[in-house]
């Protein structure tokens, strides 16, 4: 006699659940993504809560408190001007995260516009891509250094310089996806139905380019934080009186032996932030990129 399978032996498929929920579940199954998300949340919370968990005065100096080592009174010690490093590192997180996120979002938006325009309007493809190739011929950090030095040490200059350096990468990613999508049957059907270019782009092309663009955005976010720290270290990035991780490291390089903590803590903050965002980007790439997807 044939035995009937127990109802508990069947697993109900995820019917009716939105793609966003299913994607979030797949992401949360990945340990590296969870670690990156937790680390990034810690950095973001520290930056947001900085006015309440520090003395709120990142530029307050005290000759009497110069070169104080880490302790209960000053968790990260003080620098050569007697400024509290715990306060400066947390306020520096606000600047670095804001610049990194702004650069990533602007690069993604402008890169998407250029990439889709090049793929859809083929008469502009050669011109736009040659400009992107010319920008990509220079290492991103060297291009950013040149633009930032020409514009002067301002926050807006840093954002313009870094955005200019990373737009080509986003544009090429979007163009590659859009070139494939424009030849699909449903895009041809939309053309035959009389849909306008704008409608096809916004309804069929752009939404299907978002996955690779989002992955690229996360990596640009991490690269922008590192690049901003580099520019500030060289003195052409975030200007005083804004606290910046790169400028704090630069101020501590002359005291790396006797006051090692000046360089150590902002360096750790840069490393943790870049690592966290890269771990998140790796998880997004594995889940969202069809070429690397290994699980349904």
From Swiss-Prot:
> Known Gene3D superfamilies for this protein?
MetI-like
Localization in the cell: Cell inner membrane
**Chain segments annotated as transmembrane:** 35-55, 97-117, 131-151, 205-225, 229-249, 260-280
Question: In its keyword annotation, does this UniProt entry include Transmembrane helix?
Answer: yes
Which GO cellular component term is one of those annotated? plasma membrane
What job does the chain carry out?
Probably part of an ABC transporter complex that could be involved in peptide import. Probably responsible for the translocation of the substrate across the membrane.
Family in the record: Belongs to the binding-protein-dependent transport system permease family.
Xref: PANTHER family: OLIGOPEPTIDE TRANSPORT SYSTEM PERMEASE PROTEIN APPC, PEPTIDE ABC TRANSPORTER PERMEASE PROTEIN
Full protein name: Putative peptide transport system permease protein BRA1093/BS1330_II1085
Species name for this entry? Brucella suis biovar 1 (strain 1330)
